[in-house]
Each structure stands twice: as structure tokens, then as C-alpha cells.
């Protein structure tokens, strides 16, 4: 039988319940959730975690995931694929465990609209689903008009590979087929964007591949920013492993790209006009399309939420987790999305049961490979301060600058272990 003690126990086992989640935080009037329905739009790191943990906290809630893809290829780890360290199968996960072990409904359709007054979601096959609470985890979309000459169509020639799948495989193919001694050029995105260290891990993994297969190739990055996550660690690793192979230029160098000639594989910036054999354009980003359609975004193009529960500030009863939400200092990453998913699940279940949501602390961990046996990491811990998630002073940190190659190898091993652990927790257990 469900009661507040069982809820607290389940949340503690999941690592969500904090010291604030004592009995004093809970209402004595626990409502029955029998027959309550939660619909989750999106089956990635955030959405799948929310769905699983709602069922884990309260198995009586009916949970449905709406996800058009029957398998999910992760962005975390996709840079490793470019270096030939893992294959597509390693990065691809299905929904069978969520269905069979957790009794979650998974419908492989696209959500086309939401009627907030009637609390229904309409799918592209015309099916209409009722909900008591809605969770939206749609990931990102791109601002295709941010650079003159670049478009969704152009990405079939100059891939972004910032949504894992065919784009990842296209970029890998281009890297493998690049002429000996050729040039790889990355156009990095402006803030905010998915996975802060991701572009620089990608440069590293392309260099790792070239070092083995195309040692006279060169790599250049034009970046509209002047600094990036783990910058000194990346640059130190680049010098140590690749010498002068990787050149990075920032905004202060005039490296903001203003125009791209797709046909001639040429990019224009104040810094220079550059032609390359392979060009990886990672565009400016915004919340996933369905978030705009539902009306969950503000003028920033992202979704404002109450950062202690991840409930939308614009529409009560609708929650947003993952890359699309505005989560204060918490970065946009797969780890963040999954942690947010667990806290959001707790918020949904406490709300449905008439309990108070405890104060939360969240965490983000990000491992990056600079080489196949050279890893670095960053950890952040966050808590709401005046309604905004801010870093906890003295908590977290980054890999030390002066480390032995054996220590870097250990961190590389930790990166693979992290990936296996988080994907198992979400999709395979």
C-alpha cells in the first residue's frame, strides 16, 4: 500500500531525498494516485528518467512516454564514435526494459499538439491521450538562420552531428574519407548550448583519429566565445598529445562566423576566409519545437521553470526537464537531464499525493576524452538560492592540471564506466 513512508524510502534509495525531506515536510493528507495519468513527451535522458522514477516512487501512477524513435542513440559518447572507439550499437538503446520491467507505456508517435485546458496530448496518428500531469523533455532545436548560408538542408553537406543518429554517421564518414593532409574545420556554437565541453571533446576525438589515420591533417575551430568548459585542460592535452594539430580561435580573434558558402566549403569571419575539406557546423540552439508549440518558452528561446521542481513557470501542471529548461547554473548535459528527471519525478509524485516537495540539491558530472586513454572531468553541485540553481561553494571541481598519464588513463576509464552506468540506470534496469 502506498503511503508517505514508502515514498520517502523510494526517494532516498534513488538518492533524491535530502535532509530537508523529513516527515515534517510532508502533509498528512496523502491523496490516492490510483488512476492518475502522467504523459512524458520525449524519451531521452530526461524523459526516460522521469518516467522510470515516477513508477519507482509510486507504481500506481499510469505513465506513458511519447517518443517517435524506437531506439535512442545518445549524444554523450557520440564523439567517441567519431574516433572509432565505440560503434553505433554501443550508443543505441531501446525501451524494452521500461515497458517490461516498469510497466511504462511507450508510444512511438510524434506529439503534435497539447490542449492545456482539456489536459490532452494529440499524436500524429490522431490518438488523443489525457493526462493529470505532463512532462516535456524535447531536447534542442537549432537556430538555422543564425549564420547566413547555413540551413537544415545545408547540414546534409556540412553536418552538425549535434543530434545523434544519421548526422553522426555522416560526419564520421566525411572524417574517414578526408584527403591525407586535409583540413577539418569546426564552427562552434554560442552560449547557451547542449554539452558545454562537447565541441572540444569532438576536436580531441577527431585529432585522435587523425593521429592514427591521417597524421598530416590539420584541425581548426572558429568559436564565437572567448572561453569554454575545461579550457586549460583541453588545451594542455592537445599540446601533449597532438602538438600543433589543433588551432582554436575565439571571439577576441574575430572568429565569429558570419557567412558560409556551402557549395565551396568556405566560411567567412573577421578572422579570415577559410576553406576546408570537412566542415562541422554546430549551430546556435533553442528549446525543442514542441516546447514552442505548447507555449513553454520565453523570449530567450528556452523554458523557464521553478528550479526546485522543474514545473513550468508559464503553465501549471506541466514540467520541463533536460536541455530545453532554464536551470540556473546547471549546464545542459545528459547527466543534468537525468538528475533533473529524478527530481522532477519526485515533484510530480509529491504533487499528485498531496505532499510537499523538499528542498533539493542537484549535481552534474561530465567526463571528456582528450585522447583514447586521456580523460578529464568536471563536477558541479547546485542548490536553489532565491529560486535559482546556483553552484554550491566548495563542492565539485575539475581534474587537476598536473596529472600523470596514468591518472588521465584512469579518468578515461571512468568516462566509459559513467556512460555504462547512466545508460543502464535509465534504459536497462
PLM features: residue spans?
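A Rossmann-like FAD-binding core segment of flavoenzymes
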Residues: 101, 105-113, 121, 129, ...
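N-terminal export signals
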Residues: 6-27
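C-terminal auxiliary extensions adjacent to catalytic cores
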Residues: 379-429
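Glycine-rich dinucleotide-binding loop and its adjacent helix/turn
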Residues: 138-212
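FAD-site-proximal beta/loop scaffold in flavoenzymes
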Residues: 153-180, 274-339
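Beta1-alpha1 glycine-rich phosphate/pyrophosphate-binding loop at the start
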Residues: 28-105, 190-231
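A conserved FAD-binding loop/helix module that cradles the flavin
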Residues: 325-360
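Active-site-proximal substrate-binding core of FAD-dependent oxidoreductases
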Residues: 349-387
Amino acid at each position: 500500500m502506498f503511503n508517505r513512508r514508502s515514498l520517502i524510502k523510494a526517494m532516498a534509495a534513488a538518492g533524491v531525498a535530502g535532509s530537508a525531506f523529513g516527515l515534517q515536510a510532508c502533509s498528512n493528507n496523502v491523496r490516492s494516485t490510483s488512476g492518475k495519468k502522467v504523459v512524458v513527451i520525449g524519451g531521452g535522458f530526461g524523459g526516460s528518467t522521469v518516467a522510470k522514477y515516477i513508477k519507482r516512487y509510486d507504481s500506481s501512477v499510469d505513465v506513458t512516454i511519447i517518443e517517435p524513435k524506437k531506439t535512442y542513440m545518445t549524444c554523450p559518447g557520440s564523439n567517441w564514435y567519431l574516433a572509432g572507439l565505440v560503434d553505433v550499437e554501443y550508443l543505441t538503446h531501446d525501451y524494452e526494459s521500461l515497458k517490461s520491467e516498469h510497466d511504462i507505456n511507450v508510444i512511438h508517435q510524434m506529439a503534435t499538439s497539447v490542449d492545456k485546458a482539456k489536459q490532452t496530448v494529440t499524436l500524429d496518428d490522431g490518438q488523443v491521450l489525457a493526462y493529470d500531469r505532463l512532462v516535456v523533455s524535447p531536447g534542442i532545436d537549432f537556430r538555422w538562420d543564425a549564420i547566413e548560408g547555413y540551413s537544415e538542408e545545408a547540414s546534409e553537406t556540412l553536418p552538425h552531428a549535434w543530434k545523434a543518429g544519421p548526422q553522426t554517421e555522416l560526419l564520421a564518414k566525411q572524417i574517414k574519407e578526408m584527403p591525407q593532409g586535409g583540413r577539418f574545420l569546426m564552427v562552434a556554437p554560442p552560449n547557451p548550448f547542449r554539452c558545454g565541453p562537447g565541441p572540444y571533446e569532438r576536436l580531441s576525438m577527431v585529432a585522435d583519429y587523425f593521429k592514427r589515420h591521417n597524421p598530416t591533417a590539420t584541425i581548426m575551430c572558429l568559436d564565437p566565445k572567448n572561453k569554454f568548459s575545461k579550457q586549460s585542460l583541453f588545451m594542455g592535452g592537445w599540446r601533449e598529445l597532438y602538438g600543433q594539430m589543433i588551432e582554436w580561435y575565439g571571439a577576441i580573434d574575430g572568429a565569429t562566423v558570419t557567412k558560409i558558402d556551402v557549395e565551396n566549403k568556405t566560411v567567412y569571419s573577421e578572422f579570415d576566409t577559410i576553406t576546408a575539406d570537412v566542415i562541422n557546423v554546430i549551430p546556435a540552439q533553442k528549446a525543442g519545437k514542441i516546447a514552442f508549440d505548447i507555449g513553454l518558452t520565453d523570449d530567450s528561446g528556452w523554458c523557464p521553470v521553478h528550479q526546485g521542481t522543474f514545473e513550468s513557470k508559464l503553465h501549471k501542471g506541466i514540467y520541463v526537464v533536460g536541455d530545453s529548461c532554464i536551470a540556473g547554473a546547471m549546464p545542459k548535459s545528459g547527466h543534468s537531464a537525468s538528475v533533473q528527471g529524478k527530481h522532477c519525478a519526485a515533484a510530480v509524485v509529491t504533487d499528485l499525493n498531496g505532499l510537499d516537495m523538499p528542498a533539493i540539491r542537484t549535481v552534474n558530472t561530465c567526463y571528456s576524452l582528450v585522447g583514447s586513454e586521456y580523460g578529464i572531468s568536471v563536477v558541479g553541485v547546485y542548490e536553489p538560492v532565491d529560486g535559482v540553481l546556483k553552484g554550491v561553494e566548495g563542492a565539485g571541481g575539475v581534474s587537476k592540471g598536473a596529472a600523470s598519464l596514468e591518472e588521465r588513463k584512469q579518468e578515461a576509464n571512468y568516462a566509459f564506466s559513467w556512460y555504462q552506468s547512466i545508460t543502464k540506470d535509465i534504459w536497462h534496469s
